[in-house]
Design a protein with these regions (language model features):
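Surface-exposed beta-strand edges and their flanking turn/coil or helix-capping segments
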Residues: 98, 107, 166-168
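Amphipathic alpha-helical interface segments
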Residues: 1-81, 111-178
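Histidine-centered, metal-coordinating catalytic motifs and their short helical/loop contexts
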Residues: 79-104
């Protein structure tokens, strides 16, 4: 039965939002205890979770489903511009290709094992946005568009947009089950 299949998507979205909020909290409040590898993984995971939500509400391939869910939950895409940023989503989905290109370019630097060159390499990773990179001093996450132009994603915007989505889902849930 298709009745209220929308809430299957709602559960999925709620789980993504739950993990987004946990990651933002960990990145923000526990950053002194996070080792660099975990910091990178958390940053990349945050981008992936945001992309998952965007794919539900703003899918090009499943436009009808996306439009139905947006209408069903009364979600204004204008209120979630950070989440549905297609440039960020597209680049994040092709992350492996960017890393392949980068690793080819950087293999010479890594083979020399010059610490100054390695530091420059780390700087390039951060400035070119080759990874999801959280800048916690400025409360933001960086990614890049397909032309490698930096995209700045404010963590506070992500929190506000995900709270808005949760609110819209809860309103609909209470209308159906008062």
């Amino acid at each position: 039965m298709k009745q209220y299949y929308e809430f299957v998507y709602a559960q999925y979205i709620e789980s993504q939002i739950y993990y987004i909020h946990k990651l933002i909290s960990r990145l923000t409040f526990q950053r002194a205890q996070i080792d660099p590898e975990q910091y990178f993984l958390d940053s990349q995971l945050l981008l992936n979770l945001i992309t998952n939500i965007a794919n539900v509400f703003d899918s090009r391939r499943k436009k009808g489903r996306s439009e139905h869910l947006v209408n069903f939950f009364n979600i204004s895409l204008y209120k979630i511009p950070t989440i549905i940023n297609r440039d960020m989503r597209n680049t994040n989905e092709h992350y492996d290709e960017r890393m392949d290109d980068f690793m080819e370019e950087s293999s010479v630097v890594l083979s020399r094992k010059d610490i100054d060159d390695v530091r420059k390499l780390i700087s390039v990773i951060q400035t070119r946005g080759l990874t999801g990179y959280a800048d916690l001093d400025n409360n933001c996450l960086y990614s890049v568009d397909r032309n490698l132009n930096r995209i700045v994603i404010k963590l506070s915007d992500i929190k506000a947009e995900t709270n808005y989505i949760m609110n819209q889902i809860n309103i609909k849930r209470h209308v159906i089950n008062p």
